[in-house]
Regions:
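Redox cofactor-anchoring modules in respiratory/redox and cofactor-processing assemblies
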Residues: 1-146
Length: 146
């Protein structure tokens, strides 16, 4: 609009300290992935990648590099909206409005904010999921015992 806002598109999610931030992010991304009409490659592919990676992390199979891949997928959906360098500084990030248009509608670019915020604010929880996968043990029977 004339005010440079997207009135009606904002959301505030309140979670307590018992909430699994990775699980919450996965549920939000699942919404965007399911709501995508599939016409735009950045939205269709990007949200699917994000959902797959988060589900892999939740299933205990997270991989080193998954966080960076999530951020890369987000930047492919809506380039330039959340510069990685600003995340590393830990300060507030100015979000340009309107975002660069890579999709027909704002659904894809809207999917970037929840993932970016979750990683920025709860990165240690994402890293813990990857560490859990790295330290997982698998029981293997040895020998042909009867």
């Amino acid at each position: 609009g004339a005010a440079g806002s997207m009135l009606g598109s904002g959301a505030i999610v309140v979670m307590d300290e018992t909430t699994d931030a990775v699980k919450a992010a996965a549920r939000i991304v699942r919404f965007f992935s399911r709501e995508s009409c599939g016409k735009c490659t950045p939205c269709r592919e990007g949200t699917t990648w994000e959902e797959d990676i988060l589900n892999r992390m939740l299933s205990g199979k997270g991989r080193p590099g998954d966080i960076e891949t999530l951020l890369k997928a987000a930047s492919n959906i809506s380039p330039g909206v959340y510069p990685v360098a600003a995340w590393e500084e830990g300060g507030l990030v100015a979000v340009p409005f309107p975002p660069k248009q890579t999709t027909i509608c704002p659904l894809g670019p809207s999917s970037v904010a929840p993932i970016a915020s979750a990683i920025r604010r709860f990165r240690s929880e994402f890293e813990a999921k990857i560490d859990e996968a790295a330290h997982a043990t698998i029981e293997v029977s040895v020998g042909g015992g009867s």
